[in-house]
Amino acid sequence: MGLTLSGRYISLFLAVQIAYLLQAVRAAGKCGTVFKGFSDCLLQLGENMANYPQELDEKENLQTICTYWDDFHSCATTALADCQEGATDLWEKLKKESRNLDFRGSLFELCAGGNGAIRSSVPFGVTLLITALSALVTWMQF
């Protein structure tokens, strides 16, 4: 299956939402390190995905990827924790909206209950890396 046009739009949507979140935090002016912290989270996620062990079986592969995904969310929540003006609430809202997107093979779907197997013909790490990098590029333009 791989990335489709609708998958690109969903990735763009998520990137715009993340950029909106960061812009709102920056406008609040009370989170001096939020950009550095959040970008560090994205970079760590990308690094993990680019370097995860290829020799794992499908179940171990999914568990490893989901661990990286969970670590990213923990990192992002921590980066936003010191911010005021509802930045953490915006992040939680973004995660909820992202879970509700009907995007087969998303990390929210695959990591929700350990139920999924990777069905995409594109390596999952590539898909996630592209999504994370598009968010980072969008963020850097602000």
Swiss-Prot record:
Lipid-anchored residues (GPI-anchor amidated alanine): A112
Signal peptide (UniProt feature, chain positions): 1-27
Any Pfam family the entry gives: NRN1
Keywords noted in UniProt: Cell membrane, Glycoprotein, GPI-anchor, Lipoprotein, Membrane, Signal, Synapse
Residue ranges of coiled coil: none
Lipid bilayer topology: Lipid-anchor; GPI-anchor
Listed InterPro entries: Neuritin_fam (IPR026144)
Taxonomy, superkingdom: Eukaryota
Propeptide: 113-142
GO cellular component: plasma membrane; side of membrane; synapse
Annotated compartments: Cell membrane; Synapse
Chief location: membrane
Example GO biological process: neuron projection extension
Primary role: Modulates postsynaptic dendritic arbor elaboration and synaptic maturation.
UniProt record similarity statement: Belongs to the neuritin family.
Protein name as annotated: Neuritin
Gene designation per UniProt: nrn1
